């Protein structure tokens, strides 16, 4: 007899109910809980899956390159990046009638297409690609690499090639290899690509496989490097009249410190970027030789952590025990990795528009909006995941004996103070911010807008001024013409920075006023509330005053039966579940703010945001309602247009979102009764009753139904806003 799904759990495989399927799916990735799992096997499985993950990423990127080369217009776009719309791929749809084919045929081709809003064209162009042949070559190389990684994943599961447990727990060796190899060497290699390929291409010198060994990236070759005359590589940078992709106005410098943006492309100078990656490469290769491995030299992480004990004694045993705790807990490691990656991803969202590094991407407004929104959402998911795995660490891996009186134990000891302070901050921010918004809303509604409470963000303006913004007249640090800092900047470092920050042609330090002050505090409220829920969930995961033995119930449980009526909805999983809604809410406010402020600036109408963003009706009417008109007009009595697909997605997103509430606001008994009724009807209907299933249908558990509801809520929320951002921006800027 064939074994039933799931193979990793005999107990579940023998379950007679449909619970078998749902619990099987729910625990497929909880490798620790699988039958016969050993610690060594666990590490090996996770390690092998990393290769699979990389293979999927390479396959996906290969697909992007392939479809653009095959069905896109990269070569036409390269000739005129500001006017030609970049094509992602063709659309083959049997439902398309003539109006649809006509509406979606654009970008200079004769078939219906999707327009790319991911910025890949700008990226490939900036790094030196110019032809479809380049794209095909990249695609095939990545396809080959995906195959290599799949093979490597399979290989590392074979008995002869499985690394042992001690190899996985050798922290110093791993740090050295990751710092030097992963970060250092790859940064050095990237700077080499920029210097040898991208910068020459930007100056009209084509570099390819047939000539890249013959074309020197700098006229002086390696002589300045070996003679210590490194300044030669910064001499004669591209001029402000440089036409990107040609030799007109081009210089010879390869490593510069200009600051600001290339006037034509409005992107960072490629020579600045190459310099940055070279510096990062050198620093990380150096860092990768700092930790003690086979030879008795270098740092020992255990010694460093054990020695981190402030002499005043106010942190108790300090970091003693942290080395062992971290080394032996995958959830602790994953939590830290997710938190770091989450912060970095949010920073990427910020930097991709404020300091764009790809040529002409700053002028592709739809792409700018899509990339900002995309990266902020990903950052939110990663950060919530960090706390979820932090909570699982406390439930499954935390050893109170090993961590006696150290920083971890002391955080748990004074969790009440941490939680109550976060609670107080959230309440303060919430009531004051909402109070001002509501006050402004009321006085505007009664026709006296001059009675609004408008607070100038003077501290934030002062920070902008100290970085060089002259608009506010603060005359401080970099914005003061007499200061040492300002004089030094024009001669020694980043001479282009002050011009860029005051030019008004970019998104660097945008002017801010009362509307920004209010939404900033609304976002601060949302961030602190999300953090409060997550921190409380993690710190109470082992137990709380109400339920001291919580850790014995695991990470997720609905209630401990009717005997202790107060124990419902207080598992660490419930905190994660609640925080997800707040996280989505936070990112909603962040992306609304970013998008509205930018579309008004791009339209040359910044006053609309400044005037309408100080009261709630302004947000609802002048941002959401006004900008949803292209979505509502996607289908109309005159037929369809190229935004119709986004209109449909906007509606469909609302539908998925609303479906979530069916699972979120309901009880298990209702579903069980409904299922029993459906089964009864099915078994008594001719033809239908020929199909039987062996498992007894059972309603989802409370936790599972919440998960299904949350997934619908999240997916619908994202679909709806994605369609809104792309269609409303496309409707304005094409």
UniProtKB/Swiss-Prot annotation:
It is a multi-pass membrane protein. The chain crosses the membrane at residues 46-69, 135-158, 175-199, 273-291, 330-353, 369-395, 417-439, 517-535, 575-596, 643-665, 707-727. One of its GO terms (cellular component) is photosystem I. The keyword Ribosomal protein does not apply. InterPro entries: PSI_PsaA/B, PSI_PsaA/B_CS, PSI_PsaA/B_sf, PSI_PsaB. Gene3D superfamilies: Photosystem I PsaA/PsaB. Phylloquinone binds at residue 671. Chlorophyll a B3 binds at residues 662, 670. [4Fe-4S] cluster binds at residues 559, 568. It is found in: Plastid, Chloroplast thylakoid membrane. One of its GO terms (biological process) is photosynthesis. Its main location: plastid. Chlorophyll a B1 binds at residue 654. Keywords: 4Fe-4S, Chlorophyll, Chloroplast, Chromophore, Electron transport, Iron, Iron-sulfur, Magnesium, Membrane, Metal-binding, Oxidoreductase, Photosynthesis, Photosystem I, Plastid, Thylakoid, Transmembrane, Transmembrane helix, Transport. It catalyses: reduced [plastocyanin] + hnu + oxidized [2Fe-2S]-[ferredoxin] = oxidized [plastocyanin] + reduced [2Fe-2S]-[ferredoxin]. P700 is a chlorophyll a/chlorophyll a' dimer, A0 is one or more chlorophyll a, A1 is one or both phylloquinones and FX is a shared 4Fe-4S iron-sulfur center. Its EC number is 1.97.1.12. GO terms for molecular function: 4 iron, 4 sulfur cluster binding; chlorophyll binding; electron transfer activity; magnesium ion binding; oxidoreductase activity. It is an enzyme of class 1 (oxidoreductase). Belongs to the PsaA/PsaB family. The PsaA/B heterodimer binds the P700 chlorophyll special pair and subsequent electron acceptors. PSI consists of a core antenna complex that captures photons, and an electron transfer chain that converts photonic excitation into a charge separation. The eukaryotic PSI reaction center is composed of at least 11 subunits. PsaA and PsaB bind P700, the primary electron donor of photosystem I (PSI), as well as the electron acceptors A0, A1 and FX. PSI is a plastocyanin/cytochrome c6-ferredoxin oxidoreductase, converting photonic excitation into a charge separation, which transfers an electron from the donor P700 chlorophyll pair to the spectroscopically characterized acceptors A0, A1, FX, FA and FB in turn. Oxidized P700 is reduced on the lumenal side of the thylakoid membrane by plastocyanin or cytochrome c6. This is Photosystem I P700 chlorophyll a apoprotein A2. It comes from Rhodomonas salina.
């Amino acid at each position: 007899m064939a074994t039933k799904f799931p193979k990793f759990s005999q107990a579940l495989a023998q379950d007679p109910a449909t619970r078998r399927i749902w619990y099987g799916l729910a625990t497929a990735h909880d490798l620790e809980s699988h039958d016969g799992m050993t610690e060594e096997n666990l590490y090996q499985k996770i390690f092998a899956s990393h290769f699979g993950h990389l293979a999927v990423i390479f396959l996906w990127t290969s697909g992007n390159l392939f479809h653009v080369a095959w069905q896109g217009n990269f070569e036409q776009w390269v000739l005129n990046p500001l006017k030609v719309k970049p094509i992602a791929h063709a659309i083959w749809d049997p439902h398309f009638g003539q109006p649809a084919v006509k509406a979606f045929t654009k970008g200079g081709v004769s078939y219906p297409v999707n327009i790319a809003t991911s910025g890949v064209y700008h990226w490939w162009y900036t790094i030196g690609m110019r032809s479809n042949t380049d794209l095909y070559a990249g695609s095939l190389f990545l396809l080959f690499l995906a195959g290599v990684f799949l093979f490597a994943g399979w290989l590392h599961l074979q008995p002869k090639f499985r690394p042992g447990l001690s190899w996985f727990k050798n922290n110093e060796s791993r740090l050295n290899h990751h710092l030097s190899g992963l970060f250092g060497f790859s940064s050095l290699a990237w700077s080499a690509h920029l210097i040898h390929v991208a910068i020459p291409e930007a100056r009209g010198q084509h570099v390819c496989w047939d000539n890249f060994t013959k074309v020197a990236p700098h006229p002086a070759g390696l002589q300045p490097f070996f003679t210590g005359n490194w300044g030669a590589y910064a001499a004669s940078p591209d001029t402000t009249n440089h036409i990107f992709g040609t030799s007109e106005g081009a210089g010879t410098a390869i490593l510069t410190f200009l600051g600001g943006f290339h006037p034509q492309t409005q992107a960072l100078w490629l020579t600045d970027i190459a310099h940055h990656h070279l510096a990062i490469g050198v620093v990380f290769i150096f860092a990768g030789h700092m930790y003690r491995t086979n030879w008795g030299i270098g740092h020992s992480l255990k010694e460093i952590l054990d020695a981190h004990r402030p002499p005043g004694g106010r942190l108790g045993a300090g970091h003693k025990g942290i080395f062992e705790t971290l080394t032996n807990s995958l959830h602790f490691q994953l939590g830290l990795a997710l938190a770091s990656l989450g912060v970095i991803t949010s920073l990427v969202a910020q930097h991709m528009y404020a300091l764009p590094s790809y040529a002409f991407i700053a002028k592709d407004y739809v792409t700018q909006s899509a990339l900002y929104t995309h990266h902020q959402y990903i950052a939110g998911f990663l950060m919530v995941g960090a706390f979820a795995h932090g909570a699982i660490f406390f439930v499954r891996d935390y050893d109170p004996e090993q961590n006696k009186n150290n920083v971890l134990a002391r955080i748990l000891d004074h969790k009440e103070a941490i939680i109550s302070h976060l609670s107080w901050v959230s309440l303060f921010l919430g009531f004051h911010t909402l109070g001002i918004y509501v006050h402004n809303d009321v006085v505007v509604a009664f026709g006296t807008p001059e009675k609004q409470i408008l607070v100038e963000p003077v501290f934030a303006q002062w920070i902008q001024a100290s970085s060089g913004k002259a608009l506010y007249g603060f005359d401080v640090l970099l914005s003061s013409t007499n200061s040492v800092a300002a004089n030094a900047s024009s001669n020694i470092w980043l001479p282009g920075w002050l011009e860029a920050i005051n030019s008004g042609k970019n998104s660097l330090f945008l002017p801010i006023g009362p509307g920004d002050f209010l939404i900033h505090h609304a976002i601060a409220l949302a961030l602190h509330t999300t953090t409060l829920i997550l921190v409380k969930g993690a710190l109470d995961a082992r137990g709380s005053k109400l339920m001291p033995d919580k850790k014995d119930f695991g990470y997720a449980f609905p209630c401990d039966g009717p005997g202790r009526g107060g124990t419902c909805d207080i598992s660490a999983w419930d905190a994660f579940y609640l925080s997800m809604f707040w996280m989505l809410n936070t990112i909603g406010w962040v992306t609304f703010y970013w998008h509205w402020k930018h579309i008004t600036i791009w339209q040359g109408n910044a006053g609309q945001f400044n005037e309408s963003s100080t009261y709630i009706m302004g947000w609802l009417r002048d941002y959401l309602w006004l900008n949803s008109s292209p979505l509502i007009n996607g289908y109309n009595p005159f037929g369809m247009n190229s935004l119709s697909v986004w209109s449909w997605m906007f509606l469909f997103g609302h539908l998925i979102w609303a479906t979530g509430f069916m699972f979120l606001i309901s009880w298990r008994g209702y579903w069980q009764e409904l299922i029993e009724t459906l089964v009864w009807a099915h078994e008594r209907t001719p033809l239908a009753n020929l199909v039987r299933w062996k498992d007894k249908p059972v309603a989802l558990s409370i936790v599972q139904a919440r998960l299904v509801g949350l997934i619908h809520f999240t997916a619908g929320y994202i679909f709806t806003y994605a369609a809104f951002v792309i269609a409303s921006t496309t409707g304005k800027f094409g």
